[in-house]
Amino acid sequence: MAPPRFDCKALYEKLDQQRLAQGLSWQDVARATGVSAATLTRTRQGGRLEVDGMLAMVAWLGLPVEHFVRRSPRS
């Protein structure tokens, strides 16, 4: 079995849904989560995230981290 991975794109999609539902800009999301705009961009691009930033964004969404962890069998 392949090691689990964090699904950054799924996190970004949830952030965007929450942002739109609350009528917020991405700058508002950055302020609310305490992460930089660059971190939000990396999330959108599926890049690597620092654990603190990732946890801050997940906490803002009110979801468990496990919601974004993907486990898949090795090919």
Stretches with model-predicted labels:
Residues M1-L24, D28:
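A short, Lys/Arg-rich alpha-helix, primarily the initiator
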Residues L15, L24, L40, L61-L63:
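Generic leucine side-chain signal with a strong bias for well-ordered alpha-helical environments
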Residues Q22-R42:
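Short alpha-helical DNA-recognition segment
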Residues S25, E50-G53, P64:
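Residues that mark the N-terminal boundary/hinge immediately upstream of a DNA-recognition element
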Residues G34, Q45, P73-R74:
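Short amphipathic alpha-helical surface patches that mediate protein-protein
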Residues R42, G46-A59:
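Short, basic-rich loop-to-helix N-cap that marks the start of a DNA-contacting helix
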Residues G62-S75:
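Short C-terminal boundary/hinge segments that cap the last helix of small helical domains
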